[in-house]
A protein has these predicted regions:
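Metabolite-binding pocket within alpha/beta catalytic cores that recognizes anionic/polar moieties
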Residues: 2-122
Length: 122
């Protein structure tokens, strides 16, 4: 039997999205561009087609767009290692946990995370 995460272990927003990023698993693409400043999300989005804003909560702003045949998520991390830690953990949760059932997915998903900016490279 798969482990079931408690409310304290897996915090969700009232709409069922992940707590800080306010994203749902189906909104996440395999390639994620990470920028620090939320204003840079729109700047990166100018280089994509079919751009769709996804969420905007605190320092975490996101959109989804396309570069050729590749869907891409652009997401701001805010300032500092603490915020980056939240982003990386919540992206992993979106990719590998069924939020409705609060259980790990049967298969794992790897994401391609690319950091764009002046510092904070992973």
């Amino acid at each position: 039997m798969l482990y079931k995460f408690s409310d304290a272990e897996l915090m969700l927003a009232p709409d069922g999205s992940i707590y800080h990023l306010r994203l749902h698993p189906e909104q996440l693409t395999d390639t994620v561009l990470l920028v620090g400043d939320p204003a840079r999300v729109a700047l990166v989005g100018e280089h994509l087609t079919r751009v769709e804003p996804l969420a905007d909560n605190r320092e975490f702003r996101s959109l989804r767009g396309w570069r050729g045949d590749t869907p891409i998520t652009v997401l701001s991390t805010g300032i500092g290692a603490g915020c980056i830690d939240i982003v990386i953990n919540e992206l992993d949760i979106l990719a590998n946990i069924d939020l409705r059932l609060r259980r790990p997915n049967f298969s794992t998903r790897s994401l391609r995370l690319i950091r764009l900016g002046t510092s904070g490279a992973l």
